[in-house]
């Protein structure tokens, strides 16, 4: 994965994780998963609801927070 992708994904997912924001995750096959992001790395997201599911990022189409969030960008990161 490109560094640019990580610069966008990591702050977004980390904010959702830290603030315990409920999310809906839509997979490329149309399935909707709901829960809170427990953890993530370069390849997977751990989504916690009644159980914890490991969801591969390549299977994710869209991540929709249940409420608006403000993403904290580190110095030097642009929004291009």
Swiss-Prot record:
RNA-binding recorded as keyword: yes
Limits of the Sm domain: 10-69
Pfam families (alphabetical): Hfq
Any one of the GO BP annotations: regulation of translation, ncRNA-mediated
Gene Ontology CC: cytosol
Disulfide links within the chain: none
One GO MF term attached to the UniProt entry: RNA binding
Keywords assigned: RNA-binding, Stress response
NCBIfam families referenced in this protein's UniProt entry, alphabetically: Hfq, PRK00395.1
Subunit structure: Homohexamer.
Task of the protein: RNA chaperone that binds small regulatory RNA (sRNAs) and mRNAs to facilitate mRNA translational regulation in response to envelope stress, environmental stress and changes in metabolite concentrations. Also binds with high specificity to tRNAs.
Family: Belongs to the Hfq family.
Protein name: RNA-binding protein Hfq
Species the sequence originates in: Azoarcus sp. (strain BH72)
Lineage: Bacteria, Pseudomonadati, Pseudomonadota, Betaproteobacteria, Rhodocyclales
